[in-house]
Amino acid sequence: MKRFSTAYLLLGILCSAAVFLIGAPSRALGAEVEHYEPLQVHVQLEKVYLDGDVSIEHKHEKVFSMDDFWAAYAGWTLVEQKKGYVLFRKQMDDISPLSKVNGYIGVSDNGVISTFHGRPEPASEPIQSFFQIDLERLESHMQKNLLKGIPFRTKAEFEDVIEHMKTYSG
């Protein structure tokens, strides 16, 4: 009988301790946890495309967890960080959405192969300049095509024209 009463006594002590411990963390944490406001961050995202175009997106985010914030931008490269501001950049393995609609490869006034939004004109500003080309080495129809602009709508078309033009670089 003494054995049962000792067992009941131990069981009672363990149950009391368990009830105390289960309630203890919430009481202890409530007293120690400080309330923090989420961090407000201006995020700038830059996508750099093969054709030289850059798209920029601005976002304002509330950051509750830095681990979650960094995980959300795992595929991006951190370029700049200061209080309340973060700049991320990503190299895209494609041409820009705008170039898929209206991209042209042409030659600038100084004979440099360049990409343009729309047909190259004397006043057109190139998106990206690539390399100098010797126009005299080109066949006359290729010269004309390049001067009026060669359209590209896909990454493959863009790469084909650039690779072909490299053979005429000076």
UniProtKB/Swiss-Prot annotation:
Keyword Signal: yes
InterPro entries per record: BofC_C, BofC_C_sf, BOFC_N, BOFC_N_sf
UniProt keyword terms in alphabetical order: Signal, Sporulation
Entry keyword Cell inner membrane: no
Compartment(s) of residence: Forespore intermembrane space
Pfam families to which the protein is assigned, alphabetical: BofC_C, BOFC_N
Signal peptide boundaries: 1-30
Superkingdom of source: Bacteria
Any one GO biological process: sporulation resulting in formation of a cellular spore
Principal location: membrane
Subunit and partners: Monomer.
Function: Inhibits the SpoIVB zymogen from undergoing autocatalytic activation by an unknown mechanism, and in this way plays a role in the sigma-K checkpoint of sporulation.
Protein name as it appears in the record: Protein BofC
Record organism: Bacillus subtilis (strain 168)
